UniProtKB/Swiss-Prot annotation:
Assigned keywords, A-Z: DNA-binding, Nucleus, Repeat, Transcription
Lineage top rank: taxon: Eukaryota
PROSITE patterns for this protein: TFIID (PS00351)
Protein's gene: tbpA
Function description: General transcription factor that functions at the core of the DNA-binding multiprotein factor TFIID. Binding of TFIID to the TATA box is the initial transcriptional step of the pre-initiation complex (PIC), playing a role in the activation of eukaryotic genes transcribed by RNA polymerase II.
Compartment(s) of residence: Nucleus
One Pfam family here: TBP
PANTHER family: TATA-BOX BINDING PROTEIN
Quaternary structure (record): Belongs to the TFIID complex together with the TBP-associated factors (TAFs). Binds DNA as monomer.
Protein name: TATA-box-binding protein
One GO cellular component term noted in the UniProt record for this chain: nucleus
Length: 268
């Protein structure tokens, strides 16, 4: 996925993910902690896509932590305080970004595309893809010489597919034998505001197997849920970002699972 991160695993990746220039989460400017986006290396991107951090496999770290607690079994999802009621939150996260990939099934001359297409830029010394934008649906495409394309910025699955087809059509009109194959949604990002402040220190301490919190590097807590496999960025203000989903239902499910946990750590 090149410079797009789906599972930010470190404070540095989370800062890049929520930066104003981020393609992973275009709505990141609404959240604290924005920073200039520095595209991770291919290795870092692959690790992030696989839900790993630079320190190793998240699953292994968490299983090891549980074994140290004498448990030896990795819980699939977080749990609220025993006996606490878990009513529905009544909150539906808003989809902020959908990242999809497409195979145009032909080699592309990126210089030709950049010269003749509107709203296209190409700086091979900086990034090995043409960056193209369209206004409707408002999206950005990363187009590679191999014929692979990444489309980001759509707010719905239908818009993502429509935008991808429009980009493919633009490439066809430039004389390339482009096809529209292997369309696949790679990541869905959602966000919401639970409208109450959260004690992040307490959450990080109680749920250390799932959490990473380094406020001097990034103001949000990184919470790695295992089932569904979603990463949540949780801010003291009560704003939440959820990423890593393949279908929108995973965003909704993850939020309903985390909501009673966050209620346990509500600031009073």
């Amino acid at each position: 996925m090149d410079s797009l991160t789906t599972h930010p695993a470190t404070a540095q990746q989370a800062r890049a993910f929520t930066s104003p220039s981020s393609l992973s989460f275009p709505g990141g400017t609404a959240f604290p902690g924005g920073a200039d986006l520095t595209p991770p290396s291919d290795k870092d991107a692959n690790m992030a896509t696989n839900g790993q951090s630079a320190n190793g496999n998240v699953n292994g770290q968490q299983q090891g932590a549980n074994a140290a607690n004498g448990n030896g079994v990795m819980p699939a999802t977080p749990a609220a305080t025993p006996g606490a009621s878990a009513p529905g939150s009544g909150i539906v996260p808003t989809l902020q970004n959908i990242v999809a990939t497409v195979n145009l099934d032909c080699r592309l001359d990126l210089k030709t595309i950049a010269l003749h297409a509107r709203n296209a830029e190409y700086n091979p010394k900086r990034f090995a893809a043409v960056i193209m934008r369209i206004r409707e649906p408002k999206t950005t495409a990363l187009i590679f010489a191999s014929g692979k394309m990444v489309v980001t910025g759509a707010k719905s699955e239908d818009d993502s597919k429509l935008a991808s087809r429009k980009y493919a059509r633009i490439i066809q009109k430039l004389g390339f034998n482009a096809k529209f194959t292997d369309f696949k949604i790679q990541n869905i990002v959602g966000s919401c505001d639970i409208k109450f402040p959260i004690r992040l220190e307490g959450l990080a301490s109680r749920h250390h197997n799932f959490s990473s919190y380094e406020p001097e590097l990034f103001p949000g807590l990184i919470y790695r849920m295992m089932k569904p496999k979603i990463v949540l960025l949780i801010f003291v203000s009560g704003k939440i970002v959820l990423t890593g989903a393949k279908v929108r239902e995973e965003i909704y499910q993850a939020f309903e699972l985390i909501y009673p946990v966050l209620s346990d750590f509500r600031k009073v």
